[in-house]
UniProtKB/Swiss-Prot annotation:
Residues 112-166, 186-241, 261-318 form the Kazal-like domain. This is Follistatin. Binds directly to activin and functions as an activin antagonist. Specific inhibitor of the biosynthesis and secretion of pituitary follicle stimulating hormone (FSH). CDD domains: KAZAL_FS. Residues 1-29 form the signal peptide. Disulfide bonds join C32-C55, C42-C88, C56-C91, C95-C106, C100-C116, C118-C150, C122-C143, C132-C164, C168-C179, C173-C189, C192-C225, C196-C218, C207-C239, C245-C256, C250-C267, C270-C302, C274-C295, C284-C316. One of its GO terms (cellular component) is extracellular region. Residues 30-103 form the TB domain. It comes from Bubalus bubalis. Residues 316-344 are annotated as: Disordered.
């Protein structure tokens, strides 16, 4: 009886499928990383078993790829002990097809590597002079502020034109916003007509320096703005009838300082290191003592546990014309504790 012959076509088909499988495996083998470090190694693993084409299809400038198909233990050793994966291949060698996002452009650096740098569109800016930013800093122009926003402060905006001021005099706020001065004697533009949502938790309650309990930070801001003078935050939670600072629990590393003038406590940030700068201006405090700076005054208050506030700039024994101007502004009761409200 004749034996059945093996068809050579079937064997060829099997070999072809095997080669295709191996080719697919080699194309898929590899690891995708989110960045290439300065040491040349890949760091921050994004996904395993990706081909270079799949890994680099995102268009991210920092994405890199390694072709080694290794086990989890090796990956762990690379990331923890070796500073990243070796043989790191960056997806982008040039700026071609690189998407840096709004306000940024791709440029080749000194090492001939593509990098995304801040390059905001300043062509439509009409005011070329100084501007005061929401961070209380003066910028040489709006374009410089936009660059600062791009680098590290995404919420940064222009408050008003001109340098940042210590009074509301000559400050022109845009739109319906109003100029007020916070507890650090910096002028800000704020809007009062904000609708505050109802509080969803009792933890949102705040006690104001006026002894009134406010449902939320939004309600305290709005009340301050409508009142046109400083209220300020005493402490978190509902107001209590405290006899001393022992009855008040401060959070967030704050310390209770007692205000003998009104018989209430106030939680304040302490432990701030005062800079050794000769440019700091002395201040006259509410205890009629002169301190080298506002920071030195706060330091003394934290040390004694008694609240101190700035009466005016300069020595208590000499009131300058500028101080009289400031007192004139204080009579208008422009003071808004933005810094004390927004810090939490």
């Amino acid at each position: 009886m004749a034996r059945p012959r093996h068809q050579p076509g079937g064997l060829c088909l099997l070999l072809l499928l095997l080669c295709q499988f191996m080719e697919d495996r080699s194309a898929q083998a590899g690891n995708c990383w989110l960045r290439q470090a300065k040491n040349g190694r890949c760091q921050v693993l994004y996904k395993t078993e990706l081909s270079k084409e799949e890994c680099c299809s995102t268009g991210r400038l920092s994405t890199s790829w390694t072709e080694e198909d290794v086990n989890d233990n090796t990956l762990f050793k690379w990331m923890i002990f070796n500073g990243g994966a070796p043989n790191c291949i960056p997806c982008k060698e040039t700026c071609e097809n690189v998407d840096c996002g709004p306000g940024k452009k791709c440029r080749m650096n000194k090492k001939n590597k593509p990098r995304c740098v801040c390059a905001p569109d300043c062509s439509n800016i009409t005011w070329k002079g100084l501007v005061c930013g929401l961070d209380g800093k003066t910028y040489r122009n709006e374009c410089a502020l936009l660059k600062a926003r791009c680098k590290e402060q995404p919420e940064l905006q222009v408050q008003y034109q001109g340098k940042c001021k210590k009074t509301c005099r000559d400050v022109f706020c845009p739109g319906s916003s109003t100029c007020v001065v916070d507890q650090t004697n910096n002028a800000y533009c704020v809007t009062c007509n904000r609708i505050c949502p109802e509080p969803t938790s009792s933890e949102q309650y705040l006690c104001g320096n006026d002894g009134v309990t406010y449902p939320s930070a939004c309600h305290l801001r709005k009340a301050t703005c409508l009142l046109g003078r400083s209220i300020g935050l005493a402490y978190e939670g509902k107001c209590i009838k405290a006899k001393s600072c022992d009855d008040i629990q401060c959070t967030g590393g704050k310390k209770c300082l007692w205000d003998f003038k009104v018989g209430r406590g106030r939680c304040s940030l302490c432990g701030e290191l005062c800079p050794e700068s000769k440019s700091e201006e002395p201040v006259c405090a509410s205890d009629n003592a002169t301190y080298a700076s506002e920071c030195a005054m706060k330091e003394a208050a934290c040390s004694s546990g008694v609240l101190l506030e700035v009466k005016h700039s300069g020595s208590c024994n000499s009131i300058s014309e500028d101080t009289e101007d400031e007192e004139e502004d204080e009579d208008q009761d422009y003071s808004f504790p933005i810094s004390s409200i927004l810090e939490w």
